[in-house]
Curated annotation (Swiss-Prot):
Gene3D superfamilies found in the cross-reference section: Alternative oxidase
Primary localization class, coarse: mitochondrion
Assembly behavior: Homodimer; disulfide-linked.
Cellular localization per UniProt: Mitochondrion inner membrane
Identification of the protein by name: Ubiquinol oxidase 2, mitochondrial
Protein residues bound to Fe cation 1: 126, 165, 168, 267
Database matches in CDD domains: AOX
Organism expressing this protein natively: Nicotiana tabacum (Common tobacco)
Gene Ontology annotations of biological process type: alternative respiration
Pfam families: AOX (PF01786)
Record's cofactor remark: Binds 2 iron ions per subunit.
Family of this protein: Belongs to the alternative oxidase family.
Annotated TM spans: 122-142, 184-204
Length: 297
């Protein structure tokens, strides 16, 4: 059982205007969290807080302190490696074909730029892959507010996808250190993609989700090639980053190959969700009419 400890709070019924200077200067300890939010075991820091918001102290099942602030123990999971990696949506309609060939066209410059540097390729892929879920979730959130209706859980499902993809990036940042020009490329690619996807989702959610479905199929292919290079010895099979071991509940002696396997499984789950979404639209329904696959990965 995961445990969260909160410091005991004083009376909170008084107005903040009535609080005296001593309360204003009260220091609230940061619970040993690293300033970076990554929880890397660095020095403890404290903050001066007028508002008295208590930091939580999270412990593992064995009672030891949880060191990550960017995710919590109840958000970790074991990846389902049994998922079918070969599934493919054959494009039949005009929108399907447009989505398919758009993704295929985007693959060529990526192949040319990264070639067989799969660590950097994975890092760049995840900076883009984390965008659609956030954009789609935000637009569905606004739609839910405008129409005074539930989303069927799709807001949460898409935001979960975005967070999961972001954790992929945080993991590969530990493995592949990007050069300055690769960081600059992230600014350019992300700036273009987030706006393009935003407009696409406004015009046609089913096209937007289909594009992501095909992007995830390409991601599965990329990680499969990554595994082949690891097996050939062309890429060093280094120990798995600590963040990956805790996030996917991997054994302590896990390696980069184990990380790539679980990431590829995640991408296969995202593929299924994003191909499922346009199928709902094609059958004359809205996403809210079909329960969202929350926690599917």
């Amino acid at each position: 059982m995961w445990v969260r400890h909160f410091p005991v709070m004083g009376p909170r019924s008084a107005s903040t205007v009535a609080l005296n200077d001593k309360q204003h200067d009260k220091k609230v300890e940061n619970g040993g969290a690293a300033a970076s939010g990554g929880g890397d075991g660095g020095d403890e820091k404290s903050v001066v807080s007028y508002w008295g918001v208590p930091p939580s102290k999270v412990t593992k099942e064995d009672g030891t302190e949880w060191k990550w602030n960017c995710f919590r123990p109840w958000e970790t999971y074991k990846a389902d490696l049994s998922i079918d990696l070969t599934k493919h949506h054959a494009p039949t309609t005009f929108l399907d074909k447009f989505a398919y060939w758009t993704v295929k066209a985007l693959r060529y410059p990526t192949d040319i730029f990264f070639q067989r540097r799969y660590g950097c390729r994975a890092m760049m892929l995840e900076t883009v892959a984390a965008v659609p879920g956030m954009v789609g979730g935000m637009l569905l959130h606004c739609k839910s507010l405008r129409r005074f209706e539930q989303s069927g859980g799709w807001i949460k499902a898409l935001l979960e996808e975005a967070e999961n993809e972001r954790m992929h990036l945080m993991t590969f940042m530990e493995v592949a250190k990007p050069n300055w020009y690769e960081r600059a490329l992230v600014f350019a690619v992300q700036g273009v993609f987030i706006n393009a996807y935003f407009v696409t989702y406004l015009l046609s959610p089913k096209l937007a989700h289909r594009i992501v479905g095909y992007l995830e199929e390409e991601a599965i292919h990329s990680y499969t090639e990554f595994l082949k290079e690891l097996d050939k010895g062309n890429i060093e099979n280094v120990p798995a980053p600590a963040i990956a071991i805790d996030y996917w509940r991997l054994p302590k002696d896990s390696t980069l190959r184990d990380v790539v396997l679980v990431v590829r499984a995640d991408e296969a789950h995202h593929r299924d969700v994003n191909h499922f979404a346009p199928d709902i639209h094609y059958q004359g329904q809205q996403l809210k009419d079909s329960p969202a696959p929350i926690g599917y990965h």
